[in-house]
Amino acid sequence: MGAVGIPLTAHCVVLFLLQMVALSSEQFTVNGLESPVLVPLDGNLELSCQLSPPQQAKHMEIRWFKNRYSEPVYLYRNGKDLFGEIVYKYVERTELLKDDIGKGKVTLRIFKVTSVDSGSYHCFFKDGKFYEEHIIDVKVTATSSDIQILMHPPNIKGVRLECHSGGWFPQPHMEWRDSKGEYIPATSKSHSQDENEFFNMTMDLFIKSNSHWSATCYIQNFVTHQEESISIVLPGVWDSWCPAWIMITLLIVIHMTYYIKLYRTYATKEMLLKSIQSSSQSSTVDTEKKEWLLKSIQSRIQSSSVDAEKKEWLLKFIQSSIQSSSVDLEKKEWLLKSIQSSIQSAIVDRGTKEWLLESIQSSILSSIVDQGTKVLLLKSIQSSIQSSTLDIETKELLLKSIQSSIQSSIMDLGTKELLLKIIQSSIQSSSVDLGTKELLLKIIQSSIQSSTVDLGTKELLLKIIQSSIQSSSVDLGTKELLLKIIQSSIQSSTVDLGTKELLLKIIQSSIQSSSVDLGAKMGLLESILSSIQSSNVDLETKVLLLKSIQSSIQSSTVYLGIKQWLLERIESIIQSSSVYLDTKELLLKIIQSSIESYSVDLGNKEFLLKIILSSIQSSSVDLGTKELLVKFFQSNIQSSSVIPGTKKLLVKIIQSSLQSSSVDLGTKKVLLDIIQTSIQNSNVHTERKGLLLKIIQSSVQSSSVDQGTKEMLLEIIQSSIQNSSVNQWTKDLLLKIIQSIIQSSSVDLGTKGFLLKIIQSSIQSSSVDIGTKSMLLKKTGLILKSSIVNPGTELLFQLIESIRHSSSVNSETKKMLSEITQSTVQSSSVNPVTEEMIEEKYQLLLQSSSVNLEAENILNVTTQWILQISSVNQGKEMLLLDKIQQILQISSVNPETKDLLLEKIELILQNPGVHQETKDLLLERIQLILQNSSVQKETKYLLLERIRSILQSSCVQKETKDLLLERIQSLLQSSCVQKETKDLLLEKIQLILQNSTVHQETKDLLLERIQLFLQNSTVDQETSYLLLKRIQLILQSSSVKKETKEFVLYIIESILHSSSVHQETKDLLFDRVQLILESSSVQQGLKCLLLNMIQVIFQRTSVQKEMKDLLFNRIPLILESSSVQQETKDKLLDIIQSILQRTSVQEETKDKLLDIIQSILQRSSVQKDTIDTLLDRIQLILQRTSVQKEMKDFLLDRIKSILESFSVHQETKKLLLNRIMSILESSTVHQETKKLLLERIQSILESSSVQQETKKLLLDRIHSILKSSSVQKETKNLLLDRIHSILKSSSVQKESCNKRNPFWKKYALDLGISVFTIIVVTLIMHLKQREADQHFELNTLWSKDTSVILCVLIMFNNRLKALIYFRLYGFSPPGKAHKYIVNYILRFSHPVFCIVYSATILYMYLQIQNKDSLFSLYNSWMVEMEMVLIFLLVIFNVKNIATVLLYFDSTTLRLFFWIKG
């Protein structure tokens, strides 16, 4: 019945699967230590676990973790320790012992166990998908047997007992018990934990006076159950006083007896000491006795058996001897050595050492001791400090003595300076250990912080600190200690303000110094910042610290990376809640001064503003800080000292904050308050207001800005419109914004509705003046007349209807509203609509060609009069200027009308009575006209003519000119302005600068603008090119005054020095300088000025390397150019000469200049006159005694390389050698210079790379020098010495020394040796094979090849190589020896020889094929003769081969000579 359901095979499969599951689930188990495992605190813990059954675990994942699987204490996977995934605090404290990992056993070791290491540890093994773990509980404990009972002095009530015990973990149980073991309640209990987390327990018990007690202090650790106890037996309190009185009486009697005896001994010893002193100081006593006396004193001082009293008397004797003037310096030195050895001795006790040091100190402080003795004393101190044998306790005593000496007011400043030099050398010394240095630095710290030490001493101490920080020899640990001293001194309230100021000056100079490493600078800044954040530091000190930070930010010498790090730290301080508000206020003042400073670059300013923005946007920053930040923003926007570029950055930041969704509504409200106050403030510039209003417009129209922000923005618009203090121009801009928002299709209906409500409330309000209402209604009319119809316009119609029916609106407003809505209203009464109509008529009249010139003139006079009246409101002025702009831009208006109109504009700008704001508005319109590409060129030309006449006029105010120049600058910087317009504008600038009648102040202003423009990296290359072209024309013009040219050159120099100027702009500027120097029409005076400027650039170390490289590239071009006048070249070479002679100029610059000289002399394109002049300069430099030896050495190296060069023309070399001859002939030249020169001549003659012709020329010159009678005898002797050494030298070729030898004689010996070698090698091989009864094989033939190659190598004067080859291969080279030989020849010979050799080998192969016997071939005299003839041909045609090579390749020629040599 059971068999029906499932077949047998199915049963088998199921059973098999179940077995597999059972096997896979029981691969291994993990066993380990039993819990709990106890470990002592600060000890090492070892936890082990084992796989069961034992198996290999190297391939498994082994993970030790505590609470979380993802936070391993140790991780091992696939045979690797994964330190990157271990929890940070266990990385350096754990290790896994894997000695028995093959058996599946591992041990985790944890070092320096802390309290947090308690808990459950999981030992987790994972193999593939299978895993198992074992859990071990660990408990950290610490017990102590150190337990004490302290009994306080008894009183009438009783006695207090105090039980102490330390070094327990975890917190133990502590109690008092009586003699029966019963619990006694404690009076009080307390505990504390030290830095190692050990518990220190204290327990009090008060016992009354009328009882006899036995008390036990009992303490127990609950984890280990270890118990410790201590007992005390107490008699009655009053009974204990009787023996005390007896003891006191006995002590008094004993002391009295002792002091009487001591007094008697004292008198005797004093007499004895005086006797010793007189003996040692007496001149009658011989030296041997004195020495014996001093040695005995030293041995007694160092002896432990001599009592302290005797030692004290001896030390008094030493002190009096040192201070005595009658004792000679040698004896004093000996005494001090004995003191030093006693101090450094380990057997001398502490008391003796203290007395010795006191005697040294008193001698140093004493005014009667001479300076020589004091120097000896100080040297003794120094050697003791720096001694490694001296124990730390003695060093402490010694340093205390030094400290008291420094802080003493009676010590003179000279001695203090010597003492401080000792301290400095000890700090900077690498032999002095860190502990000693720490003690020394503590002395410095206490002296700085002490109020008793005078300011001069403190200044000396601070100089030590400064030199140690800046020194590269001082180790990092010492510098860290120094920085801690600085920080503690700054934060200390005991240190006076003058000392702190000195300290901060040191910090500042160290930060700005290039010699101080980056780590030390960061440490100094960190100490300043931590002091600022500290609540202990007073406000005056913080002010000093912040000034130091300010100078670091504004300094150009401070590295950019340090500045950015500093600014980041400032940001964290601002955002910190722990820092006080007054500190933050001071920090913001620094930021503000940095923003207003011209020395701080725009990049750092942007970074500062971003810091403030992030602080405003941060939710962690408190409201008080945010208010300070907002005030800062407001003051910077409203400040006149802040440059426009910075203000634009501020405005951009505000805009991004308003449009950001991450900024909370409260912060936005604070920012909007800034905008509102700035708009309504009359002191804020109109341009800044315009930027702020653009922010409002873009934010309202932006879809990313939330509705709450938009409502707040619109409320600002409403309050500004309704505010009577806001000027009409601002209101007009606000109304334009309203108009554009209503007409915009991107703005949602809700925003438009809100805007219309603003208009309605403003029209209905009685507080709003009639002028504002008129403007509002006018804008309403413009919206209604617009062809753009959208829901906003419909809403406006509804608004008009509601205003008409409103009872709160007065009749006049309603009347104006009705006039606007009617398109054909004609009214004679004065109202805004009439004004608009008059303006329209005025525009039509001016545009009409039928109107006569007289009528136009009347109209223009009227315009001028309206703009000049200060009572006319700004809104009307704006409208009028709009019309003027339109007239000038329209091409249909005739030029005469435009000219008249521009004449009137000029008169307005020249009139000092016209308001500056009106002029600014007018100039804004002029800028817009010039930027417009649709405006005719003729109109622009007329306009620029007027600008020129304004700038040239002396009656125009400086402010007006400044405004005008600002507009010109922005025009040139704008990329949308046409090139043609810029060219016209620059032409006018040129004419102004060339005009001698123009005031110098105007020219200065203009040139300042040019400088700012060129330094701006955003300006395009084309505009820079145009401007530099004009500068060139100004400098070349003879009509321009010298003062103007000098100012232009000053600007050029400052641009070139500036690191903010783009490299391409500098390159363009150099092009222009080069063109000026090349021009013959330019005056020589101007060229001299330019060249002086170049000299200054070269000599300055602050000038960038790239800058100098650009200048270096130009010098060869100027000198090579034939168009440049010789006079200019002379001046340039004079400058090069003076630079080379200067010691202050950098070596790198000089090296570069010498490279240029060398390249000029090596070029064939350079004119002969230029070379001659250049060589004159070289001669002058070498003849001058004031020029440094190193400089001359440099120059002579260059001369040598020129003479050795193949590319230098022979004529140039001839000229150079003429100069060398004239130097050697000159009697004024220093003998050392001549010696250097002759050394170079020797090296040239000895060199194989120098051409034969050059050597010949040089030898001719030497010959003429020796013949000359004008040459000094010393020079000739030096020259003959050099010739003698050259002739002796084996490296010199025969060609150089003996030119007349026939060519074949040189190789006669080589040829003989070659033939002899061939014969010898052949005979040896023949005899060798005969003895062995062997037949000749092919290898025998290659032995002949070996002899051939020997012949070739010897032929090339290379016997050594031949011998090496002979030794390497022996008599029988390998079977394919010809391959090695051919390769060798290819490397060291010419291809012609290879062809000859290959032909020979081929011929030999052909002969082999035709002969039966190799032996007969070997004996064939024909082959031998042919080979000899071929090699003789090669030998006697070396000259011809050399000639061929000369035409083929100069490099191969050099190689040929090298092999030959």
Swiss-Prot record:
Top-rank taxon, per record: Eukaryota
InterPro entries membership: BTN3A2-like_Ig-C (IPR053896), Ig-like_dom (IPR007110), Ig-like_dom_sf (IPR036179), Ig-like_fold (IPR013783), Ig_sub (IPR003599), Ig_V-set (IPR013106), IgSF_BTN/MOG (IPR050504)
Signal peptide coordinates: 1-24
Gene3D superfamilies: Immunoglobulins
One Pfam assignment: C2-set_3
SUPFAM superfamilies the record matches: Immunoglobulin (SSF48726)
Gene Ontology CC annotations of this record: membrane
Cytoplasmic side: 1328-1345, 1409-1427
Transmembrane segments: 1307-1327, 1346-1366, 1388-1408, 1428-1448
Domain Ig-like V-type: 26-139
Tissues where this protein is expressed: Expressed in skin and, to a lower extent, testis.
Listed SMART domains: IG, IGv
Membrane topology value: Multi-pass membrane protein
Intracellular or extracellular location(s): Membrane
Residue intervals of the Ig-like C1-type domain: 142-231
Function: May act by engaging a cell surface molecule on immature T-cells in the embryonic thymus.
Miscellaneous note of the record: Encoded by one of the 11 copies of Skint genes clustered in the D1 region of the chromosome 4.
Similarity comment: family membership: Belongs to the SKINT family.
Listed name of the protein: Selection and upkeep of intraepithelial T-cells protein 5
UniProt lineage: Eukaryota, Metazoa, Chordata, Craniata, Vertebrata
